Design a protein with these regions (language model features):
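Ribonuclease/tRNase effector modules and their secretory precursors
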Residues: 1-87
Length: 87
């Protein structure tokens, strides 16, 4: 399935990098394809979550548009905050 990024999502790469957080398109694609947790409570939006590093997870907000996945945004978060959220 092809993955497309919104303008906001593309800008997010450089915003996070300015804070010292490096995220790649490959990492995002991997989390979407094999998430540790997926939150479907905000359909049609999905939130896929996967490990970013030892302390943090990466949460990816996306929607399905036909055969394409559209990444809207993504953000790192502390594992300690999200491990309690068993969605």
């Amino acid at each position: 399935m092809p993955i497309r990024f919104t303008k906001h999502a593309l800008e997010k790469f450089s915003v996070l990098k300015s804070y010292g957080v490096s995220v790649s398109r490959t990492q995002i694609a991997q989390i979407i394809r094999t998430p540790e947790i997926i939150d479907c409570r905000r359909l049609p939006l999905y939130i896929a979550q996967g490990e970013l590093d030892k302390r943090r997870v990466l949460r990816v907000v996306y929607k399905q548009k036909g055969a394409t996945i559209v990444v809207i945004t993504f953000c790192p978060g502390l594992k300690s905050h999200y491990e309690k959220d068993n969605t």
